Amino acid sequence: MLITDQDGGIINDPILLKLAEDHFWLSIADSDVLLWARGVAACAGMDVTIREPDVSPLQLQGPRSRDILRAAFGDEPAELKYYRFMEYDWNGVPLVISRTGWSSELGYEIFLRDGSKGDMLWDYLMEIGAPMGLHPGHTLSLIHI
């Protein structure tokens, strides 16, 4: 989806996840979309609560991401269709896994609902993914792939 200003300029291109009938997540790349959403809700007189979720997102992007995700979490998350998501229990750690990402490649976003387990998840994925070529990257990595 695109969030635009009154002149059609792009503010952000977030992913919207509908976790329940009355519970949505707006996963943003950057910017002040939280403030924008609060402003829209207040101006429209909506009876909603808008807050930043306590999650830690991790991107798993690239041509081997499905293989790595399958090795880490099994077939069901690895076979998610584009722009779909699922909630997943990883050894008692709640995750939301979506088939989305910023790389224009095959990819997934893993939202860790317990940020204190971030190091554990990172180490686990790096251990499983290293033999398949997984390494830390960032947006500038794309120009070198």
Locate each region found by the language model.
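Extended, compositionally biased flexible segments
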Residues: M1-H23, S27-C43
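Helix N-cap motif at beta-to-alpha junctions
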Residues: A29-L34, P63-S65, R113-G118
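Residues forming anionic-ligand binding surfaces in small-molecule and nucleic-acid pockets
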Residues: I10-A20, I50-R51, P94-G107
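A conserved active-site cap/scaffold subdomain adjacent to cofactor or substrate pockets
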Residues: L106-W122, M126
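Conserved small/polar residues in nucleotide/adenosyl-binding loops
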Residues: I143-I145
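A common structural junction motif
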Residues: A41-T49, E76-P77, L125-P136
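Internal amphipathic helical hairpin motif
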Residues: M1-N12, S65-L95
